[in-house]
Design a protein with these regions (language model features):
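Outer-membrane beta-barrel biogenesis signature
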Residues: 17-70, 150, 156-158, 169-173
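Outer-membrane beta-barrel proteins
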Residues: 27-31, 50-56, 100-102, 116-121, 146-154, 170-175, 230-234, ...
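Residues on the lipid-exposed face of transmembrane beta-strands in outer-membrane beta-barrel proteins
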Residues: 31-33, 44-46, 94-98, 108, ...
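Repeated loop/turn-to-beta-strand initiation elements of outer-membrane beta-barrel proteins
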Residues: 40, 103-108, 155-159, 216-219, ...
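Outer membrane beta-barrel transmembrane domains
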Residues: 55, 62-76, 231-272
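Outer-membrane pore/translocation modules
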Residues: 111-228
Length: 272
């Protein structure tokens, strides 16, 4: 399934509490700001992603090319015969922050995920399309706990670091009804991409820089690394995110921002 590697967003931010809207990065950026001693915050974020097409080694690949690839896990059928069409993901994230001191902010995040995938099935021998089916999974996906630590703060620039752990708590053995290449319906283990977790623990390390251009203009950069330090038979690959954003303050409670994201994820490690 082809994923989006470069994302550009135009975001409108509204603050309904005491802080200024420009003081918070675009909604897709996590761990972007710190709080003063005794301050706390609760957040609820919703996002949606849809993907179409397939890729191999970073290049687009057609259904016909997939159907001549050897089945790596079985000789029946000998070739891959079930091909994804499109996939959607809905994510709901509940988070909280609390600052015990001016230089340390504690943060937690939990995510609920809903996945849906449409697939085509091709006959094991004749290789003709015999139909399509849908598989889905939804539940709590992961929990994370982090500490944000102030590194350097000046009049117009601030640096802080993030160190934390992310726990995958979603089911890694989700099953669903599958239309098989023999034109039968069977209850089977869903593919890796449809699983809600991998029973892994990941170390989270990040660095964020915020620069104030003027009272109405700010600029920010952030890099975050997710490295697996404990896993079972298989786990999703390590991830790296880089975000760069610009914000313009329309008023105290309203700002406009644009964000550029680059992301990289390594291949799945191991197999089930």
């Amino acid at each position: 399934m082809r994923s989006i590697q470069l994302i550009f967003l135009l975001v409108f931010s509204i603050s309904v509490f005491g802080s200024q809207a420009i003081g918070h990065a675009p909604i897709g950026v996590m761990a972007d700001h710190m709080h003063k001693k005794g301050e706390s915050m609760i957040s609820l974020r919703a996002s949606y992603m849809k993907m179409k097409g397939n890729s191999l080694d970073g290049n687009s690949i057609s259904d016909g090319e997939i159907l001549v690839i050897d089945n790596p896990h079985s000789n029946s059928p000998a070739k891959l015969s079930v091909v994804p069409i499109e996939m959607s993901m809905k994510m709901l994230m509940l988070g909280g922050m609390y600052a015990p001191t001016d230089d340390i902010t504690l943060m937690f995040m939990t995510m609920f995920m809903d996945k849906s995938m449409n697939l085509n099935t091709f006959h094991a021998m004749m290789r003709n399309n015999i139909g399509s089916f849908n598989s889905s999974s939804s539940d709590l996906s992961d929990l994370s706990f982090s500490a944000l630590v102030n590194i350097n703060e000046q009049d117009k620039s601030r640096w802080h670091a993030e160190i934390g752990l992310k726990f995958s708590v979603g089911d890694k053995n989700e099953k669903g009804k599958v239309l098989t290449p023999m034109n039968t319906n069977m209850e089977m283990l869903l593919p890796y991409g449809m699983q809600l977790g991998d029973d892994s623990i990941a170390l989270v390390v990040g660095f964020t820089n915020l620069y104030t251009l003027s009272d109405a203009h700010t600029f920010g950069n952030q890099i975050r690394f997710f490295r697996n330090i404990s896993s079972e038979e298989w786990h999703y690959g390590d991830k790296t995110y880089f975000d760069s954003w610009y914000q313009y303050s329309v008023s105290r409670n309203f700002s406009i921002s644009s964000r550029l994201r680059l992301n990289h994820q390594q291949d799945i490690s191991g197999f089930d």
